[in-house]
């Protein structure tokens, strides 16, 4: 079944930090952006406690604390898809965590958008980056989740910058991020 992630930049809440989440069955990787929403950085790995049924557990509490601590204006939860855009078995889990976060934020009077961002190949890219840095998969499982969250969020931030035409200007590019001729 085809699943479609949200589009970066659509109904954008404006400047401010974003939180990215890589939801797994055992852990949730967390990343945060800078205030300018240009660069994603790892934050922590939260042990997964909340299941598909039953009450929110400590993991949701911790995620809400992080969102509050970073004064986030948007949360991006990775939507697991294959290269053809079909949803994996983990789609329900990602949507469930997104729903629970949205519900808790709304209950506390905070209308922070919770989006579903494209997660294709993020764990693969994160694993390759860790291997290249000398960390093996077994030793780096918790770090892999954070690195995957960074990939999810950075992909979102880059898409947002393109959609809003706010690519950073460098000495080699003009104000729109284009290379001079």
Curated annotation (Swiss-Prot):
NCBIfam families associated with the record: RNAse_H_YqgF
Pfam families assigned: RuvX
Protein name: Putative pre-16S rRNA nuclease
Record organism: Corynebacterium efficiens (strain DSM 44549 / YS-314 / AJ 12310 / JCM 11189 / NBRC 100395)
EC number(s) on file: 3.1.-.-
Main subcellular location: cytoplasm
PANTHER family: POLYNUCLEOTIDYL TRANSFERASE, RIBONUCLEASE H-LIKE SUPERFAMILY PROTEIN (PTHR33317:SF4)
Record-level GO BP terms: rRNA 5'-end processing
Physiological role: Could be a nuclease involved in processing of the 5'-end of pre-16S rRNA.
GO cellular component: cytosol
Recorded family membership: Belongs to the YqgF nuclease family.
Stored InterPro entries: RNaseH-like_sf, YqgF, YqgF/RNaseH-like_dom, YqgF/RNaseH-like_dom_sf
Top-rank taxon: Bacteria
Enzyme class: hydrolase
Segments for region (Disordered): 1-20
GO molecular function, one term: nuclease activity
Compartments (UniProt record): Cytoplasm
Keywords: Cytoplasm, Hydrolase, Nuclease, Ribosome biogenesis
